[in-house]
Amino acid sequence: MTKISKKTVLVGLSGGIDSATAAKLLKQVGFNVVGVHLRLWHKKPSVLKEREDLVKGVAQKIQIPLIIYNAQKEFKKYVIDYFLKELKNGRTPNPCIDCNYFIKFKILSQLASKLKADYIATGHYARIKKIKKNNKVIYELLKGKDKNKDQSYFLWRLNQNILKKTIFPLGEFKKEEVKKMADFWQIKITKSIKESQNLCFTNDLEKFILKNFKTHKGAIIDLTKNKKVGEHLGIYFYTIGQRKNIRVPYKEPYYVVKKDKKTNQLFIAPASKKEFFQSNEIELERINFVSHKPKLPLKCEVKIRYRSQFIKAILFQKYKKYHLKILKPVSFVTPGQSAVFYQKEKLIGGGVIK
């Protein structure tokens, strides 16, 4: 990174190596760095205190001031309440998408405006490219250089107002390089914060569901026979593509392919009958285009889950609604999850699967 004149940047600090290294990098190139830790939610207040103590230690090591912002109210509204609402409607939400947009980036942006800071930054593995098009400055969101760690998928809701004042210091680096930098600067996290694909606000989803919903057992229907073959534990416990806890008397693997909240029925099909769980068209809602609305139809590559492979598709509009035509049928398209579309390195936008 190039040396710059003194400008202030607010850096989101989680207590992990990535955000700590991002903050140190920015300080090294001449920014006036202020750390911001967002207090979210955990059922054990002691866990929150442990994390805050960890972040304080990181800020002290890097020698930067630290702001601790209580974001519990916003987190409950935009993440937990939305998650519960989607579950209640029979969908499988990805709360990390809304957490990034409504909590991390919106709150950091609001604090930056209030404190008259020039930029905000996080430890995400993603990149931003500033271009000029038709005499207009546009900020494009790109994949991180480390393809295994790329986190652009989670950022599809970001807009130009946020991107124009955002810096991703780690976007050009691989995880191994970040670890080496942290070692060189002796940034040590005394208590490891695990990188996890699980929900940050609960480590036991079943208990969380039982606490928030009345669950009822119901029929499991085999779609190939159109008859009841078992009983499920409660429809909220299952998601499309799930194999676990399907209690049926078959040796062949069976998967959840559909849920009917009204009848409390779970529909399954065997792995050998792909016609029951494959799709070649996806309808989207809550669409966002990061830079600008592209000319449609648009050839693109799509991810329908964070760790899924890219699939070739065409984005188009039908009756004013956005659809993805999948060129090769894809399995277990899950309502509530995010479909994010790219052209090469550039993230064009995303939407929620209807």
Kindly give the residue locations of the regions a language model identified.
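ATP-dependent adenylation/nucleotidyltransferase module used to activate substrates
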Residues: M1-W156, E176-E177, D183, V256
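AMP-forming adenylation/ATP pyrophosphatase catalytic core
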Residues: K3-K6, S14, A121-K354
